[in-house]
Amino acid sequence: MRIIATFLMFTMAAPVMAADKMTLLLDWFVNPDHGPIIVAQEKGYFAEQGLEVEIIAPADPADPPKLVAAGRGDLAISYQPSLHLQIAEGLPLKRVGTLVATPLNCLLV
């Protein structure tokens, strides 16, 4: 009986699965625009969804889309106008979501 109980315990236990790893390249150093991402990382929301997210702030803010296009990152934060220009230049990029719904680019006089 003890052997059967042990067998059932091991076969009925939920399988442990490794988290999917991904790299998220920010558009600049960490700032308030990235609040939802940082909160999700700190509170463990990514981990709850089976994601192990590495967040990287670039040395050059123009690099993240290029790095994703080259396969050196999974997601990049960029600006919509820049995305249109990069696609026109032939980079294989696709917009998959919105972090900040209102553009933060403006001209002040």
What do the predicted segments below correspond to?
Residues 13-15:
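N-terminal signal peptide c-region/cleavage motif recognized by signal peptidases
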